[in-house]
C-alpha cells in the first residue's frame, strides 16, 4: 500500500513536470521554434483543428518558420488564426506556403516573459508541494487507523520528500535554462 502511494506521488509529480515543460516550451524566445505554434487553432472544415494537423511546420532559418498548407483553401483561415494569436509574427504567402518572420524581442518583452516564466514555475512548484501534502495526509490517516506504523510513516515521508526534491530540481533547472535563453540577446 505504501509503495502504491509513493508511485502515485511520483506519477502525479512527473505528470505535473511534463505539463510544465510543455508550457514553458511554448514561451517565445526570439528564435524560430515550431512549438510556438502548437497552441494555434484554426477554424476550418466546419470545426476547430490544430494548425499542425492541416499543415506541416518547419524552421527555415533562425528567424523564419515555414508553414506548408496541405489544402490551399485553408490559407485564409490559417492567416486569421495566426493574426488572432497575438504572437506578433509578420508573414507572407506564396501559393501553399506561409512564411512567418519572428520579430526581434525588446528588453521589456524579455523581462515580461521572465516574469511569466517565474509565475508558471512557481505554480508548478505549488502543485508539486500540494501533491506531496496530499500523499502525506493519506499516509497519516493510514497511521492513525493503525494500517501503518509510525516508522513506516517517517520512512515513507523521507522517500516522498526525496521524490519531491528531485522534481523540484528538474523544475529549477528548466527555469534557469529557459531564463538564460530568454535573456540571451
UniProtKB/Swiss-Prot annotation:
InterPro entries: Ribosome_recyc_fac, Ribosome_recyc_fac_dom, RRF_sf. Keywords: Cytoplasm, Protein biosynthesis. Its main location: cytoplasm. GO terms for cellular component: cytoplasm. GO terms for molecular function: ribosomal large subunit binding. Responsible for the release of ribosomes from messenger RNA at the termination of protein biosynthesis. May increase the efficiency of translation by recycling ribosomes from one round of translation to another. Gene3D superfamilies: 3.30.1360.40, Ribosome-recycling factor. Belongs to the RRF family. One of its GO terms (biological process) is translational termination. It comes from Ehrlichia canis (strain Jake). It is found in: Cytoplasm. Pfam families: RRF (PF01765). This is Ribosome-recycling factor.
